[in-house]
Amino acid sequence: MSWAGKILRVNLSAGTVTSEPLNMEWAKAYLGSRGLGSKYLVEEVDPKVDPLSADNKIIWATGPLTGTMASTGGRYTVITKGPLTGAIACSNSGGYWGAELKMAGWDMVIFEGQSAKPVYLYINDDVAELRDAGHLWGQSVWRTEEILKSSLQDPLLRVSSIGKAGENGVLYAAVVNDLHRAAGRSGVGTVMGSKNLTAIAVRGTQGVGNVQNPKAFMAAAKAAKKVLADNAVTGQGLPAYGTQVLMNVINEVGALPTRNHRDVQFEGAKDISAEAMVPPRATAGKKHLVTNQACFGCTIACGRISKMDEGHFSVKNKPEYWGASGGLEYEAAWALGAANGVKDLEALQYANMVCNEEGFDPISFGATIGAVMELYEMGVLTKEQIGVEAPFGSAEALCEFADMTAKGIGFGKEIGLGSKRLTAKYGHPDLSMSVKGQEFPAYDGRVIQGIGLAYATSNRGACHLRGYTIASEVLGIPVKTEPTEHEGKPELVKAFQDATAAFDSAGVCIFTSFAWTLADVAPQVQAACGEEFTMEHLNHIGERIWNMEREFNNAAGFTKADDSLPKRLLTEAAKTGPGKGIVSKLPEMLPKYYDARGWDSEGRPTSVTRERLGL
């Protein structure tokens, strides 16, 4: 079987680290990573727990394909109850850390309790121990990794850590590995910081040699890689341009949220697009884009490595930012750019580097800045209050806010609370573009009806990665649906949500789903695990996971009222583009979505659904 078969349990209050067998019944029912980690959380954590208390737990979980030769098989998920939303938080990351944990012989690490002082966990194959991290507290993500590799004399060490944002309680702090790969959303890094846990450093030399049927697995993996290579998105578009290629595409569709969703098209989209990363700068004659980059086992290589203009105001006297770094990608470029009306590409790169360096989510950060800039233009916030002039389009304000938030100083402390809490404090809660407290990603939910429904019903708050209907509504994958049409979208959203839960739990990247279906994943999982995992079986597992997450949220106090969208999307029509005049049809779609899910009229799984899914 491709599961390692054991987990680490770390009690931070007691300072103990113990090994225990993986619950194989749960593994077969929930697969791994997001699904299996969530099952452990649901069984062990009170849904009403304070996310930042010692009673909450935080889990790092790999999938059965993590660490194998399956393409993109380097993924892992961090699972906890999130502080930004109060809902279940499952945040996925790539890079090499997940594969390294699996190669050390572990499927999962569960942290419980709260340390009295900063600590980190060191794993070297079968040996795992908590160590003092006083020398790491206050360091950046980048510096923490550098210190650990040097002090442990192991340049191949893989580190998953927080920066100052996680230590300072930014509610959307991230867990970062390999310098610029992150479990970025929902504040998982905030929970890590609340437990005085700074990092997990892992070295694995055992490999993943327990694939059940190696010959069948290699054949299935090879066939699946060919599917990726032959696909226009995974074989051409993403390797050449990365996700940022979507900037002009979504802008032309008229669904690029601009200036806190007041507009749906950005006049500066071309200035912050993937195409803008390639030509030489006029100032220095050097390109923004240095190269692309792949995570462990990935044959897509969508990652970007770029370099800033050393003369830009944001880094002019900061040589530590002159080297190559990760980014930009579409979501960050949108959140730091169009969402705030900023078209200075260098400023976007700087703010993105700060997010990576100090460990916080650029989506929630950028979307919160959009609300701040709108409040500033309304006169609700003043320069004296926030420390800088902040009209829409101000690159200087964006960079200042990034520094403030990272360091937890000045108005940065309020930005770190997220848009829901900030706008409520200043009397304008309708200006928070969020669901369940988590900020919107880079697609307008009016013009693209399905993604609006996906935001409203996402178990972790507004999220494109929980049901990426953009594939169908914009890109025509697997079939083209009309973005402005709301009929049929409840069934489409459910299908994407269930399949995505299965992809996540297998341990592969969701970007493979541009080319793969679960029919491509199933033979790989089946050969690796030695159990019967058909496409239908995996889809059933995905549906089970979705409903389990939903029931956790219901028990935490979430209701039908939380499956909503901001007033702006429901009452203010799109002003331009193909969707001009359209608002979200969420009220019409939500009851049909509940029916498709087998839930009652209040959004609770019925007894028939629970029995069918084995909940």
Label each PLM-derived region with a short phrase.
Residues K149, L156-S160, K164-S186, M192-L615:
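Extended C-terminal regions of large enzymes
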Residues M1-G189, S194-G235, G242, M247-A276, ...:
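Protein-protein interaction/assembly regions in multi-subunit complexes
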